[in-house]
Amino acid sequence: MSSFFLSISPLVLALFHVVVQVCSQSCQVAISELQSERKVIILNSDKRSLKQPSNGKYSWKSGESIYFICGKDLKTLTCSPSSINAKRFDCVKPPDVTERDINRECNGKSSKTFQMGFRASGGLFVPYYELCYLMDTCSVSHVKHRLLGASFGGVSGTREKSFQSFVCPGLRYNTHYTQASQKQPDPRFYFQRGHLFPDRDAPVFAWKLATYSYGNCVPQWNTINSEGGNWWTLEYLVFKYAQQTPNTEYTIYDGVLYDPRNKQYLAKQEKKIEIPVWFWKVVTNQTHVLKVFFVSHNLKGTKQTFCNTNRCVNDRAKGTKTVETWDFYNEASRGITHCCYWKDLARKNPLPIEVQREINNKKN
């Protein structure tokens, strides 16, 4: 038996040498080394789409062209394993985050679909995610983004960034979100900028900057939006689920429902930036709808439900571990939450028709 292993050992060593040689002939940069807003936007070879990291790093073969945006400039490097490292991707300026109107309705006649992404000189625009905006009230309807667990590699969240204004000229988005402007009767409760596409889901630090737009947030009670609230908890659970299933790419839809019979606005005088009564999230993969979640925005609680059967658990307690994947707090101030399969919505589906049509193309 030992002579057999001795006889093949040269072959094994040769194969090992080839593997090592192939690995040494590639360029790799960990996304954990790109934790600065003044880092590049790395592109695919088409130079018009974002390159997705794998297992927390970018990789190129020796001699392969590396395309990236630095500030507003499109640049190119050639993969040379001895010379490519994170320092080669330092930029003087951060990426230019902007939106592009793609001229498509998404929730009624007053709605417009926008792509959020990064702009470079020469008219180049690289899209990242898509959002639906209600132009008459300057309010968000819903947002769609991709989530791939294998992309991540220890990238922390951004510090609280200034949100970028959106497409309603003259509207003082930032002012209306201040506590002084809101004048809430109980100072414990006030509206925050509720992310729809959370920056946590963006694997690359510079990509996170694109989520800080007023086109991607709605007024949300602080006790629901902050850590310990059910919307924050839902974002966290979806993110962890994606990391535990790293080979599956998810498409996430995040949106809100407004009350047409009792409209409330953050900008009261202008009747802009509508305050939602529900938040919703749909998690899908390439062929199936995993679940649809609803989080109430009523601090006094609600008996309304959109699901025939609640497939979430509502016995989460602060400071204790839970074995359930989808477990939430049963407290109105944190946002009463229920969830179900897409088919469980039956005739009660409250989502925009355009979203329903897109999701119905998947197998449920």
Swiss-Prot record:
EC numbers for this chain: 3.1.-.-
Pfam families (alphabetical): Endonuclease_NS
Protein name: Salivary endonuclease
Spans through the membrane: none
Location(s) in or outside the cell: Secreted
Record's keyword terms, sorted: Endonuclease, Glycoprotein, Hydrolase, Magnesium, Nuclease, Secreted, Signal
Family matches, as SUPFAM superfamilies: His-Me finger endonucleases
